[in-house]
């Protein structure tokens, strides 16, 4: 494979300013061009994109600027002989800090005070409501880049960290690593259950009514994975019934979250618009990955984060 051009698809604008991304790639060694929706591709072309377009299949290589590539038809890329890479590995810090923020918000009741501020109300919490994260247990489901970013920050806050990992292999700062078949055991005693898994056939619908019934009544769910990992109707029912105390949700089965979703109206639900990995340096992080792979193509080495 020989790359003669990198096309920056207009869809990257959903995650970062395209021009800043192009400028970050100015030293790439090949022309870097903005590509609109009618752009055509051919041999020698590489594409950086937020989502899939059929025209990309005529290029040699497509880089997804996100970690999640579930919108890309992997089998079709394989049949077309088009390389596909993703941006996993660069989100640990941002997502880890976001999750730490969620947990601190619930523990210190910051969301309740913000709500009261909007009403110009000097509302004090009930004595039993505020708590500290130190000594509390968090279960991180999925111990890849995202999960480890959460683990390290939770450990720094003095939390007891357990996790769920397909292999069951040990991870630094995680006291116990469970395999997925022991999910209920892993989440049963956790004050927070953090979902940081990719969306696969195995993880779709992984958290539903039985899991909410297993969780502590004072526990909160945090989802920075993918919306369909959780059965949303069961989550609403669990919040309604008091099976769990709250949830911090960055991802949803349907995005944007519909205006009539009952999730908007729970006092102890934090909703963010799929931005847990957002950072003003994102264009630089993705550019570094692309630069690394351009160099690997030149030397014939295996691409970093190759999906197909």
Curated annotation (Swiss-Prot):
GO biological process terms, semicolon-separated: carboxylic acid metabolic process
A GO MF label: NADH binding
EC number in record: 1.1.1.-
InterPro entries xref list: D-isomer_DH_NAD-bd, Dhydh_Halo, NAD(P)-bd_dom_sf
UniProt keyword annotations, A-Z: NAD, NADP, Oxidoreductase
Catalytic residue positions: 226, 255, 274 (proton donor)
Binding site for NAD(+): 145-146, 224-226, 250, 274-277
Keyword NADP annotated: yes
Subunit note: Homotetramer.
Protein's name according to its UniProt entry: D-2-hydroxyacid dehydrogenase
Species the sequence originates in: Haloferax mediterranei (strain ATCC 33500 / DSM 1411 / JCM 8866 / NBRC 14739 / NCIMB 2177 / R-4) (Halobacterium mediterranei)
Lineage of the organism: Archaea, Methanobacteriati, Methanobacteriota, Stenosarchaea group, Halobacteria
Gene name in the database record: ddh
């Amino acid at each position: 494979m020989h790359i003669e051009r990198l096309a920056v698809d207009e869809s990257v604008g959903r995650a970062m300013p395209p021009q800043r991304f192009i400028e970050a790639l100015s030293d790439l060694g090949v022309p870097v061009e903005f590509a609109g929706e009618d752009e055509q591709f051919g041999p020698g072309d590489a594409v950086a994109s937020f989502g899939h377009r059929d025209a990309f299949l005529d290029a040699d290589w497509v880089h997804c600027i996100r970690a999640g590539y579930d919108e890309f038809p992997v089998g079709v890329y394989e049949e077309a002989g088009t390389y596909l890479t993703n941006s996993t590995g660069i989100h640990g810090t941002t997502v880890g800090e976001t999750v730490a923020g969620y947990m601190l918000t619930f523990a210190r009741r910051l969301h309740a005070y913000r709500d009261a501020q909007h009403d110009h109300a000097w509302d004090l919490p009930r004595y039993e409501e505020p708590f500290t994260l130190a000594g509390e247990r968090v279960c991180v489901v999925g111990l890849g880049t995202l999960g480890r970013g959460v683990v390290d920050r939770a450990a720094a806050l003095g939390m007891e960290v357990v996790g769920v990992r397909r292999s069951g292999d040990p991870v630094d700062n995680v006291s116990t690593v469970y395999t997925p078949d022991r999910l209920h055991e892993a989440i049963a005693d956790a004050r927070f259950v953090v979902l940081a898994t990719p969306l696969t056939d195995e993880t779709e619908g992984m958290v539903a009514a039985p899991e909410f019934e297993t969780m502590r009544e004072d526990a909160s769910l945090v989802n920075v994975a993918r919306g369909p990992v959780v059965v949303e109707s069961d989550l609403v029912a669990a919040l309604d019934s008091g099976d769990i105390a709250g949830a911090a949700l960055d991802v949803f089965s349907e995005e944007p979250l519909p205006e009539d979703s009952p999730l908007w109206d729970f006092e102890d639900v934090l909703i963010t618009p799929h931005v847990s990995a957002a950072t003003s340096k994102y264009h630089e992080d993705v550019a570094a990955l692309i630069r690394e792979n351009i160099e690997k193509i030149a030397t014939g080495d295996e691409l970093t984060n190759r999906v197909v």
